[in-house]
Every structure is written in structure tokens, then in C-alpha cells.
Amino acid sequence: MSAIESVMQEHRVFNPPEAFASQAAIPSMDAYRALCDEAERDYEGFWARYARELLHWNKPFTKVLDESNAPFYKWFEDGELNASYNCLDRNLQNGNADKVAIVFEADDGTVTRVTYRELHAKVCRLANGLKTLGIRKGDRVVIYMPMSVEGVAAMQACARLGATHSVVFGGFSAKSLQERLVDVGAVALITADEQMRGGKALPLKAIADDALALGGCEAVKNVIVYRRTGGNVGWTEGRDRWLDDVCANQPDTCEAEPVGAEHPLFVLYTSGSTGKPKGVQHSTGGYLLWALMTMKWTFDIKPDDLFWCTADIGWVTGHTYIAYGPLAAGATQVVFEGVPTYPNAGRFWDMIARHKVSIFYTAPTAIRSLIKAAEADEKIHPKQYDLSSLRLLGTVGEPINPEAWMWYYKNVGNENCPIVDTFWQTETGGHMITPLPGATPLVPGSCTLPLPGIMAAIVDETGHDVPNGSGGILVVKRPWPAMIRTIWGDPERFKKSYFPEELGGKLYLAGDGSIRDKDTGYFTIMGRIDDVLNVSGHRMGTMEIESALVANPLVAEAAVVGRPDDMTGEAICAFVVLKRSRPSGEEAAKLATELRNWVGKEIGPIAKPKDIRFGDNLPKTRSGKIMRRLLRSLAKGEEITQDTSTLENPAILEQLKQAQ
């Protein structure tokens, strides 16, 4: 049974526990519907009410939504605020100064607690140091850092100055880092000597040096290095500076620079179907508002909660639900440097038990890998740990299959914790379709219903609504405050990617297929409709991987598709044509390993193909177009039932089938 069939045949319903619902921010479906009705009646008034209630404005806004240059929407445009002030200073003023903001656990298990007062001082010292280096409002700063308090502080320091940050995941290669440095026009890079993952030191500074050596980064005048391990690093005098030295003797107060609500808070790169990563630009006001609203609604955050989002700050989940949302909510959160399987696969459960985590938010891929580990070794099964502090569970990054959902519900939540299966994207800024833990009856594998104010729908290829029970294209019909503003430096690509004329130019295209239940109207996400793969919750463009493969001197041609994978959700499958004869046996295995490592070096380890098949050529139409639908069937091990009448070289299908 396919994953989507499994979800559509799922009829188990789990209602919110009464004790949870009684104290929840949104305690019932009636309360949910009332908020949806409010948004329907007065859309701008709905958003304006929350923006005024929840955020501190240096200059109050008078305009709510400007649609005059759609789809380049503007929210709260004449208002001014500062994201760092809203995350830190307000906590100093409202009695949270000595509350722990971050419980940091290093890879080796060392624990550090940082209060809001201490975090504020750390951020201010770094912001002052950046100012002395000439970094100002509007400058772009790339952050290539390990999971750390310093990584979060670097983001907050940029926001404090009005500098736009662009965080690059520490697992990306020198080439990927260089592309982002060039595209965003960075004037500074903040990195670390090394990062620790699973007991191993990874050389971030060396990769950063390689990236800068590739050229095009002449605007980068300062490289600031956090001393994480004390490992030896290369050094360029006049350019490289230790983070400690930049912050030394700086005052621990720094006035937060007010910026317009539409000022770019950050640019975060995500994979596109055309190969070149897209710089998703987010605003300050609308983004921060939704980060805080979803902390309150989806996570039902309370003053005594201990929140733990296991994402990396290099992804949007780490932006919204580590660097901004929890701090804006005045929450205490866990930040974890390591991996879930070190020193063993009980690490997450051990940390929940030791720290008494109450809200736990992780990826389905992590859950599936931990299920496998727990089944292999009873000693690291979650039932061996005291997880009684948990009151809410969440999933993010990809759809979760009902089987994994049930295991998570029973073995981690002890059948007492609602699960918020959150659908959202880099481009949406925060949750879009998700259960509300005190209100929504849960169905395993379904992300259920859109949040109030989010006008999600399912349409056909012409933009017309499809009836419940019919699959279609997921869209959002009205702009919302946290939405992507543009693709950095490429407004035309923004319009074409997200507001295509084929759908009328007014609907936000999520890029995912979806279906709504006939009876409940619940949404189930069916996967990407474009050439973007979702591997372990990470979006990877097929074109990007193909370009990396073809850059290898041995490769003439390559095509990449996805196939379902029990562990990672989707696995990368590459079909490769060499410039020489097709290898077989041990030679093919050896070459496949070489090409995997090549892709890992070009893009990063997450992009390594799981399967590589060699062929004399690829299945193509007579006009030379690669027939990817046939490759998808081959990758899945399915019989070819599609029409192959336009296929120029039918024999290649059997060859590629045998090549597995």
C-alpha cells in the first residue's frame, strides 16, 4: 500500500485530552471556527488586531495590507519595529530577565544555561562589534555556524542592527556556500573553527576559506570566527577575526535599530526546480508576527514550558521555531548541537527525560530512524525513559505516515500528547495547515485544517476549486503577513514560481499536491508536483543534483528522480550516462561511490544519491526530452504501464531496469 493510500484509508480519530483543551489558547473547534469567521469577515482587521496586541512597534502602522503591486504584497508598511527588541528587550522589561532563554546541550553532553539577560548582553556585544567593523542597516551577513547559542546570537545581532542575515546550513559544501555569498552580496561571514556532530569535528572555517577562494566574494571584508573546538585553522590577516576579539570590551547594551516592517529580516536559500537555489526574502513585521502567533496557537506555549525544536538554524524551522518564535514568546528552549544517534539512538529520549522537555518538535525522518533503532535495541526504546514531562508533540519537514505517527503517539507521548503535524514551507514563514492541540480531532497522517487567516484551497491545473475527495494542487488564495516577499534579486522568477499565470496569477502555488477528506475537509499532503525532492525534510532540486553530476569529468549526462523511502521519506535516484562505456559489477559499484562523494562535495552530504544506475543513454522522446515519468517508475521498481509510443530508444528501459 502506498503512503497516500495508507493515509486515505485512515479512520482513527484522537480527540484532544480534556485537561489539555481546558487550558489551551484555542480550546475548541467552536473557538477555531470563530477565529476563521473573524478573518473571513474583516481580513485586514484580523491581522491588524494581532499585530498591535503582540508586537512592540517603534512607530505604529496605519496601513495594513497593500495589494497595489500584487503579488509583491506589503504588510504594515508604514510601521517600524526591531525583531531583536521584540525577542530580547521585552523579556527584560516584563520580568523574564533572569528566566532561562536557552538550555544548550553540546554534542558531548555539556549543558549551558543562558538567561534572557545574558543572551541580551551577548547579542548586544556582538552587534556593537559588528558596528565597529562597519556593518550597518541593509548590509547582508552570511552565517555558517554550528548549532550553538552563538549561532542564535549572530542572527539576533544582525536583526538588532537592521542587517539582513542569510544562514547557510553547516552541512553545505564550499561551492554551495560560495553561491549564496555571491548571490546575496554578503559583506561579512560569521563562521566557526569547527562544528561537532556525532563525536566528529567538521572543518567549517576550512570550508569557508575554500568558498571564498572560489571567487566572486570580494565584498566579504570580514570573516568572524567562533572558537568552538580550538582546532587549527587557516588565517587571512586583515580579514579574519576571532568572535571573542570582536566582542571584547564592547558594551553589553546596544540600541535596537528600528526598521520598516517590510525591511528584509533574512534571506534563506531553498532548492528550486531550475537548479539555482532561490533566495527566499522575508520581512521583519509580518514574519515575526506569525512566528509568535504560531508559537501561541500551534504549540500553545505557556510560561513554564520547556520547548525543544530539533531543527538546525540553517533551515527555516530553526529560524522560526528556534531563533525567533520561542524568544518572542518569552519561552525557555533547548538548543542541541549534536545528532539523535550519538552516543546512541536514545539521545533524544534521554535529553527529554533529563531536561524535562514539555513540547517536542522533530522530523518524521528522525522518528522513523529511531523506531528502527528502538526495535533493534530495547535498551534505547523510549519506554525505557521517563518522558512524563511531555504534553505536546510535533512533526515538521515532510508528511508523516500513519504507522510512524501511531508509534510516536503511543511510545513517546504515552497516548496522552496531541501531535501537531505541521505543514508549511521556507516560503510561508510559519505553520499553514496544522492541528490545534486543544481543539482539532487528530487523524494519523493528516495535517488537518488551515490556521485561522490562512485561505488554503485545492485547485486543478486551471486554478478552479476541486471537490473534497479529489486530488489537486495546493494553493493559498489570499496573502498572509509571513509570506515570502520575493526571490532575492529575481522578481520575475518569484512571480513565475509562486504566482503562475496558468493559475490566474493571484494564487500562491505551494508546489505540493494535496487532497481533502470528503467528510472532514482535512488536508493530506501528497508530495511535490515539481522537480523538487524532499529527503529527510530537506528540499533538494533535481536540477541541482544533475548539474553536480554532469560537472564530473566522467559524466556525459544525468537524470535524477525520487523514489519512496521508509527512512528518509524520499530517496535520490540518479541515472547516469558516462563519456566512456557503461560499467558493471564491482567497477559500477566503485564508480557509484565516487560519484556519491563527488555530489557530497559539490552540494553537501544530504544531496548524495542513494541509488546510481548506469546506462548507455537515457529514455528520451524523439525531440530529445528525457522521459522522467519512466525513470520514476524504474526507480520505484514498478512495471512500465505508461504510453511509450514517443520513446525513441525503448530498449534502454530494460537495460536501466537490470542496472539496479
From Swiss-Prot:
Sequence positions that bind Mg(2+): V550, V555
Domain of life: Bacteria
Modified residues (N6-acetyllysine): K625
GO BP terms, alphabetized: acetyl-CoA biosynthetic process from acetate
Keyword set, alphabetical order: Acetylation, ATP-binding, Ligase, Magnesium, Metal-binding, Nucleotide-binding
Catalytic activity: acetate + ATP + CoA = acetyl-CoA + AMP + diphosphate
Binding site for CoA: R197, G198, G199, K200, T317, S536
Residue ranges of the TM segments: none
Gene Ontology MF: a single term: ATP binding
Binding site for ATP: G397, E398, P399, D421, T422, F423, W424, Q425, T426, D512, R528, R539
Description of post-translational modifications: Acetylated. Deacetylation by the SIR2-homolog deacetylase activates the enzyme.
EC number, UniProt record: 6.2.1.1
Cofactor needs: Mg(2+)
Pfam family of the protein (one): ACAS_N
Name of the top EC class for this enzyme: ligase
GO CC entries: cytosol
Stored InterPro entries: Ac_CoA_lig, ACAS_N, AMP-bd_C, AMP-bd_C_sf, AMP-binding_CS, AMP-dep_synth/lig_dom, ANL_N_sf
Family stated for the protein in its record: Belongs to the ATP-dependent AMP-binding enzyme family.
Alphabetical list of NCBIfam families matching this protein: Ac_CoA_lig_AcsA, PRK00174.1
Function: Catalyzes the conversion of acetate into acetyl-CoA (AcCoA), an essential intermediate at the junction of anabolic and catabolic pathways. AcsA undergoes a two-step reaction. In the first half reaction, AcsA combines acetate with ATP to form acetyl-adenylate (AcAMP) intermediate. In the second half reaction, it can then transfer the acetyl group from AcAMP to the sulfhydryl group of CoA, forming the product AcCoA.
Protein name: Acetyl-coenzyme A synthetase
Organism: Cupriavidus taiwanensis (strain DSM 17343 / BCRC 17206 / CCUG 44338 / CIP 107171 / LMG 19424 / R1)
Lineage of producing organism: Bacteria, Pseudomonadati, Pseudomonadota, Betaproteobacteria, Burkholderiales
